[in-house]
Amino acid sequence: MILGRTISLFLGCSALVSGALIEHHAASSTDQPVDVPYNLDMFSQAAVLAQETYCGEQAHDYGLKLGDATLLWTAGDGNVRQRVNLYQSDSLGIAVAIQGTNTSSLRSDLHDAQLRPVDPDSRYRRFLPQGTKVMNGFQKGYTDLVDDIFDHVKKFKQEKNESRVTVIGHSLGAAIGLLASLDINLRLEDGLFKSYLFGLPRVGNPIFANFVDRKIGDKLHWVVNGRDWVPTVPPRALGYQHPSNYVWIYPANSTNWKLYPGQENVHGMLTVAREFNFDDHEGIYFHTQIGASLGKCPAVLGGY
């Protein structure tokens, strides 16, 4: 726990700021922010499902209703494996929500601390461009879950006669969720419907980020709250890069949100000093609070 946070804080302080060339549909990293062109209610619905992954007491309360979603299945205990919840949602389809860091679990913390860029896992490597690298710890978190996720998503798609699959995550769960979003789009019939990722760290190198833009750029919605430092790590100095088009809520926990085009937009989150605590990271995203320590259990949709 201490090791993971210490390394992450140090690397956050050393993060570099610069623009980057991006794929055609992703706009330019020097473009000015624009109004968020998405359905904001879907962000709120996704946020409450992200929060519920931190709620161990309701982990197997199948049938639990959260907004328009019903809990179908759960795996992982947040210690050996990150918790993943599957829901049936009117707006999101089969929703896959992945837990963020459990700071009381050394294994969970180590997922955040294993910073080495590595080749993609053999299950999906052939679908990605040569030279793709992803962070070792995040990929380990995903490969602990991937087979269970695929088996149960296929099962519930058939049972519920549902073609849409949405991936949701916060923090470490967002990093794992980005890998899951791309993998589902590449290997699962009907692909990805939407992805909602809150407090997303950098996951892969520029080749990975460009491929994400090409394959799921129009389906990916990721959000930064205020001065949250987590999205600034791992640093670009280690070869990591974000995909395009994030939503920045600034000031934190407010309703002032804009979409920042391109990769590593020069007008966005990197223009303000980071606050190296978890207040903004575990903040209010589209009227719903997400966080292992600050969020409510059972999760509550809206209210802020």
UniProtKB/Swiss-Prot annotation:
<keyword id="KW-0378">Hydrolase</keyword>
<comment type="similarity">
    <text>Belongs to the AB hydrolase superfamily. Lipase family. Class 3 subfamily.</text>
</comment>
<dbReference type="GO" id="GO:0005576">
    <property type="term" value="C:extracellular region"/>
</dbReference>
<feature type="active site">
    <location>
        <position position="228"/>
    </location>
</feature>
<protein>
    <recommendedName>
        <fullName>Secreted mono- and diacylglycerol lipase MDL2</fullName>
        <ecNumber>3.1.1.-</ecNumber>
    </recommendedName>
</protein>
<dbReference type="InterPro" id="IPR051218">
    <property type="entry name" value="Sec_MonoDiacylglyc_Lipase"/>
</dbReference>
<dbReference type="GO" id="GO:0046872">
    <property type="term" value="F:metal ion binding"/>
</dbReference>
<feature type="signal peptide">
    <location>
        <begin position="1"/>
        <end position="19"/>
    </location>
</feature>
<feature type="active site">
    <location>
        <position position="281"/>
    </location>
</feature>
<keyword id="KW-0134">Cell wall</keyword>
<comment type="function">
    <text>Secreted lipase involved in Dandruff and seborrheic dermatitis (D/SD) probably via lipase-mediated breakdown of sebaceous lipids and release of irritating free fatty acids. Shows activity against monoglyceride and diglyceride substrates, but not triglyceride substrates and does not exhibit regio-selective production of diacylglycerols. Hydrolyzes both 1,2- and 1,3-diacylglycerols. Also hydrolyzes distearin, dilinolein and dipalmitolein.</text>
</comment>
<feature type="glycosylation site" description="N-linked (GlcNAc...) asparagine">
    <location>
        <position position="253"/>
    </location>
</feature>
<keyword id="KW-0443">Lipid metabolism</keyword>
<feature type="disulfide bond">
    <location>
        <begin position="55"/>
        <end position="297"/>
    </location>
</feature>
<keyword id="KW-0843">Virulence</keyword>
<keyword id="KW-1015">Disulfide bond</keyword>
<feature type="glycosylation site" description="N-linked (GlcNAc...) asparagine">
    <location>
        <position position="161"/>
    </location>
</feature>
<feature type="glycosylation site" description="N-linked (GlcNAc...) asparagine">
    <location>
        <position position="102"/>
    </location>
</feature>
<keyword id="KW-0442">Lipid degradation</keyword>
<keyword id="KW-0964">Secreted</keyword>
<dbReference type="Pfam" id="PF01764">
    <property type="entry name" value="Lipase_3"/>
</dbReference>
<dbReference type="GO" id="GO:0016787">
    <property type="term" value="F:hydrolase activity"/>
</dbReference>
<feature type="active site" description="Nucleophile">
    <location>
        <position position="171"/>
    </location>
</feature>
<dbReference type="InterPro" id="IPR002921">
    <property type="entry name" value="Fungal_lipase-type"/>
</dbReference>
<keyword id="KW-0325">Glycoprotein</keyword>
<keyword id="KW-0479">Metal-binding</keyword>
<dbReference type="InterPro" id="IPR029058">
    <property type="entry name" value="AB_hydrolase_fold"/>
</dbReference>
<dbReference type="GO" id="GO:0016042">
    <property type="term" value="P:lipid catabolic process"/>
</dbReference>
<keyword id="KW-0732">Signal</keyword>
